[in-house]
Amino acid sequence: GVILERALSLDEIRAIRAACGVDLECFVHGAICVGYSGRCFLSRSMSERSGNRGACSQPCRLTYDLVDESGRTVVKGRHLLSVRDLNLSDRIGELIDAGITSFKIEGRLKDVGYIKNVVSHYRQRIDRALASRPGFCRSSVGESRPDFQPDPSKSFTRGESEYFFDGRRAG
């Protein structure tokens, strides 16, 4: 199978599906890289862990100071490189219809509470979407019945976005 890049639109995903018959895996939840995905060198230069080799230390999620050319601090201790987190949970049905066969949720450097909450949320969304699509079924037989109401907004987030799912906007 192929893991698709996070910045693809739904139309681009459909075009890829039409052009090839391999299983397609799509990121649906997690950090959106501030750099060009797959071409980040910040992690490697700051921590010896390469994001291009699946070991990103996420230095873009840290706080930084913004200093002007005179050396004056303009902004202190802010998340200057952190863009919002990807959340496509409302679009699961569209992704299934577009031919996605597997969903990827980022869990690197996340605590167990975050993982439990987000995975449970997506499990419910996927099950609901599959139930309304005759001919589709789960690829696993296990059941998940959390004793809480999963809600990703209750876990740490820098704000949510569907990124380029509906296409890129000019400007």
Q: Can you say where each PLM-predicted feature lies in the sequence?
A:
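Surface-exposed amphipathic alpha-helical tracts and adjacent flexible/coil segments at the periphery
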Residues: 1-171
